[in-house]
């Protein structure tokens, strides 16, 4: 069977960039020895740093380096010449807005991709790495453009498809009293990963309209001296955090509630769902830090359960970054079937929540009403996260 021809539109292509850890699976195959049904035929790089890898890889693997996005999709002709597009707008040097959001050119990438679709009268599946865009306005525009042009679209983080320790999938229709997600890192860049971890779990809860997610009514970012005050008002939240803490192996000394508020980029996102569920995303920077498997943890309390459900979203890193192979498998499924393995609406929602959280922080913790997020509706997918053995990390001597 012919492999699907793929154009990749990336901000930059250097070692360990998202372009590298995703596209390596198309060029060299998966860590388990398998290969996706895709081949990279063209590449557009928005920036070319001194440590760029793409030019040497193009010589080795035979894909074309293109000077425009349109050229990457048409290979210089008048017709669409690819079966799918990977838009990887992550890493590189781009400005920030006043709220601290990095203005990666994800909307511009998608607009130029869609311009080719409109001109040629053809659309193919598009994967958008991470959140759709920094701002809700841009994200919603992209979503509506995809619907208008009937573009099969997948987006988001590798967190929902990575390994879980212990393996945990909440049963469809379970009743939740509350949920928390613990994460680390830059509030926007890694806060998004934490939100994706939260959402991929709690979207399986019992919902009034036959299992259909109904969206979010308000978001608040708590930080500084007030960081833990709201969280500690809910006994179930403390119980869930107490269940997570034994899983965390790598952290600073001292009490999490005393240490984390001192960090400038530590915060807790409070997410209020339309059906009444409340969840917290805890980012205790200064206390929690990255090490083996990353540091993303989920906990939820099911109604009537004796103990909370708890797991770590385990990231295999550094090389071969096998969790990105799992994300590539989800992308490949869409390219082969024209159907995303899980709804892009999940990431539309997490994008909107993240933007609201960043706005709340910019406005000194003001609660943000989110009427625009109340009508994002979708049903949870049965796409399975990573199973089986986790590949061993490969380290150069200098990295050991």
Regions found by a protein language model. Give the residues of each.
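NAD(P)-dinucleotide binding in Rossmann-like oxidoreductases
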Residues: 251-346, 397
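Beta-strand-loop-alpha-helix segment that lines the small-molecule cofactor/substrate pocket
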Residues: 90-160
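Short acidic-hydrophobic, aromatic-tinged amphipathic segments that line or gate anion-handling sites
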Residues: 63-73
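C-terminal helix-rich "cap/oligomerization" subdomain common to oxidoreductases
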Residues: 2, 100-102, 333-400
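Rossmann-like dinucleotide-binding domain that binds NAD(P)(H)
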Residues: 179-277, 283-290, 349-352
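N-terminal Rossmann-like dinucleotide-binding module
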Residues: 1-60, 179
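N-terminal Rossmann-like NAD(P) cofactor-binding module of classical short-chain dehydrogenase/reductase
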Residues: 82-89
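Short amphipathic alpha-helix with an adjacent loop that forms part of the alpha/beta core around
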Residues: 72-80, 167-170
């Amino acid at each position: 069977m012919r492999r699907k021809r793929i154009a990749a539109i990336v901000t930059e292509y250097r070692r360990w960039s998202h372009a590298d850890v995703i596209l390596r699976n198309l060029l060299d195959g998966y860590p388990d020895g398998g290969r996706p049904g895709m081949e990279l035929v063209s590449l557009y790089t928005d920036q070319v740093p001194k440590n760029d890898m793409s030019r040497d890889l193009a010589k080795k693997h035979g894909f074309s380096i293109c000077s425009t996005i349109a050229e990457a999709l048409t290979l210089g002709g008048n017709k669409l010449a690819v079966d799918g597009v990977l838009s990887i707008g992550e890493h590189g040097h781009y400005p920030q807005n006043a709220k601290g959001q990095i203005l990666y050119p994800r909307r511009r990438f998608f607009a130029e991709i869609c311009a080719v679709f409109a001109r040629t009268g053809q659309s193919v599946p598009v994967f958008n790495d991470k959140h759709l865009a920094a701002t809700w306005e841009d994200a919603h525009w992209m979503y509506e453009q995809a619907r208008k042009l009937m573009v099969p679209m997948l987006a988001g983080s590798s967190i929902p498809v990575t390994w879980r320790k212990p393996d945990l999938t909440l049963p469809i229709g379970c009743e939740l009293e509350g949920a928390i997600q613990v994460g680390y890192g830059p509030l926007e860049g890694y806060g998004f990963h934490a939100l994706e971890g939260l959402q991929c779990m709690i979207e399986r809860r019992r919902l009034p309209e036959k299992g259909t997610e109904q969206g979010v009514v308000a978001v608040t970012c708590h930080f500084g001296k007030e960081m833990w005050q709201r969280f500690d008002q809910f006994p179930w939240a403390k119980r869930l955090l107490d269940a997570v803490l034994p899983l965390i192996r790598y952290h600073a000394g001292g009490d999490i509630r005393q240490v984390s508020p001192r960090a400038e980029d530590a915060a807790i996102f409070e997410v209020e769902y339309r059906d009444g569920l409340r969840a917290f995303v805890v980012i205790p920077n200064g206390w929690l830090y990255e090490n083996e498997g990353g540091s993303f943890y989920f906990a939820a309390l099911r109604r009537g359960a004796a103990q909370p459900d708890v797991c770590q979203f385990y990231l295999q890193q550094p090389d071969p970054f096998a969790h990105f192979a799992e994300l590539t498998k989800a992308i490949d499924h869409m390219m082969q079937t024209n159907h995303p393995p899980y709804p892009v609406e999940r990431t539309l929602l997490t994008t909107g929540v993240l933007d609201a959280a960043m706005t709340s922080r910019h406005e000194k913790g003001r609660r943000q009403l989110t009427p625009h997020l109340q009508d994002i509706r979708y049903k949870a997918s049965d796409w399975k996260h990573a199973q089986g053995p986790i590949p061993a990390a490969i380290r150069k001597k200098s990295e050991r």
